[in-house]
Amino acid sequence: MLTASQKVLQQLAALLLERAGLKITPDGFHSLRLALSARMPVLGLEEPEHYIQRLTGAGGEEELRSLLPLVTVGHTEFFRDAKQFRALEKSVLPDLVSRSRREMRKVSIWSAGCATGEEPYSLAMVLAELGALSLEVDLWATDLNLAAVEAAKQGRFTSRRAISINQARLTRFFKPVEEGYEALPALREYIRFDGQNLAVPVFDKVALSSLDLILCRNVIIYFDLPTIRGLMDRFLAALRPGGLLFLGYSESLFKVYDRFEMIEVDGAFVYRRPLNDKSMRAPPLRITPYPGEPDVAARRPVPADAFTADLRKRMLPEDVPLTTRLPAVSASSVAAPGSPSVTLPALGASSSPRSVVPGRLPAVSPHSPLPAIAARSRVTAELPTVGSVDSARPRITTELPAVATTPRAPTVEVPAWPTLLPPAERLAMAVRKMAQGDFSAAIAGVQRLLADEPSDLDGLLTLGNLFSLTGRIPEAREAFAQAIQREPLCVEARVFGGVAALQAGELSEARSELSKALFLEPTLAIGHYLLAQVHERTQDHEAARRSYRNAIAQLRFPQRPLAGHYPEMPDSADAISRAARYALAALEEQPLR
């Protein structure tokens, strides 16, 4: 492997932090050495210092784009996180399509950090199934890695990557090609792919308050705290009031950023720009035109573009003008308490409190008695309007005689969303108990989490590990089985299942579980390391040496963090490499070089 000084690695880490917001600690310097070994020969460079000069000189931005995929994990999949996509399919996207049609505009969505495109294609399939046309949708998918963006544009996926797409969707939206499937042109029309660095201080392609939905999942785990906060400021400014932000399942803004409000949608926790947030309203930034689109200043005003005209034609009869779509509401009209509930207003839309009352309440006229008051037999008229409150005045009861004065229009207090602790934070509390050696409290904490979130993958894996550490092997097996039931391709359930079996002395089971994990993810270094330990226990020293060497060899590939938590398991590339080399040296009875 290339030899690079600590100073060069620190300079490279500082550049990645400054230019891309990536925080790489000394534990991750092994991945930087691997990246240098891969990029320097391509550029014809022999000294790491010259590579640093290339990054900081002309053409440095282009080289940065080539470097980043080597130090980050671009793992993604179709319909990733079933709970979030259930919320998108059942509530979020249907509401956005309906609302955008009412407002005669496009649904505006940003898939930020889209990698090779599985996420935006998943969104496009759902939108198509909801009946949204491609011309009704502006689905912008971006990534810093331009090679990944180009691959996403092609829409080609191997059979293994397409495994989570059901057969009906494969038949409708893809055509079989060699070694996999290719998205049909009709599906690709929904998406426009582009390069975008999320760490830049200004998004010059995004207008203020223009987006309905942003998905930025499993991206901010690579960023340092200032970069995350700056990115959240820009996301908040880009979303419409009431717009939603989806982060990765294990990502939380708890004690990081408090300007979003967290809400629950069909079991998924998401972040929302407050409805009454006016702090970001300002003259919109100039939007970069799409390729081939005339500049904003060069566009000639037209009474109605083709998009709006098409929507009018499909949504309204030709003889009905737009202004007659909704009936006029008379201020004096009276609705009985049992009348149908009022339709909720669109998010961010203003409405008079006399015509629309938030929540499912009966329509109420300003001049009709409140239902609760009208039901009281001893009151024959409404209470008078009250000015200032006199604390010395005795409390008013229903025994007061009727007062014939003009009543106030009723108001309804809508309770604020409760402050909810996200699953990731609840799990972190249990992990702290585990670190303190309080396993009973840790188990109880994770079990309470799973009572509320029964399919929480991190929780299931951590609970299995807690059972394993406390000798409750059958319960550990059950927890890992539930994790596999939720995610059939869950590598971690196989890895931790192998560890539990190893602790119980079930070496055949341990070998089987770890082999299954490596079948699913052959480059997982920790899997090879643990399998080597199983071989050592069975006295198969040759197989153990081979597995330790495999663990070291796989470190040339980026290693992702495992879901779930197991204390003191080597997790960084350097830690795995060091442990494997020591074990290998001990087996070979040779001193470390």
Curated annotation (Swiss-Prot):
Under which main EC class is this enzyme filed? transferase
User: What's its catalytic activity?
Assistant: L-glutamyl-[protein] + S-adenosyl-L-methionine = [protein]-L-glutamate 5-O-methyl ester + S-adenosyl-L-homocysteine
- SMART domains, per this entry? MeTrc, TPR
TPR repeat segments: 423-456, 457-490, 491-524
Keyword presence, Repeat = yes
A GO molecular function held by the record: protein-glutamate O-methyltransferase activity
Q: What is its EC number?
A: 2.1.1.80
Q: GO biological process: what's one of them?
A: methylation
Keyword list (alphabetical) reads: Chemotaxis, Methyltransferase, Repeat, S-adenosyl-L-methionine, TPR repeat, Transferase
The chain positions of domain CheR-type methyltransferase read: 1-276
InterPro entries recorded: Bact_Chemotaxis_MeTrfase, CheR_C, CheR_MeTrfase, CheR_N_sf, SAM-dependent_MTases_sf, TPR-like_helical_dom_sf, TPR_rpt
Annotated S-S bridges: none
Any Pfam family: TPR_16
The UniProt function text for this chain reads: This methyltransferase is one of the proteins required for the normal aggregation of M.xanthus cells during fruiting body formation. It is also a component of a sensory transduction pathway that controls the frequency at which cells reverse their gliding direction. It may methylate FrzCD to form gamma-glutamyl methyl ester residues.
Name assigned to this protein: Protein methyltransferase FrzF
Q: Which organism is it from?
A: Myxococcus xanthus
The lineage, from the top, is:
Bacteria, Pseudomonadati, Myxococcota, Myxococcia, Myxococcales
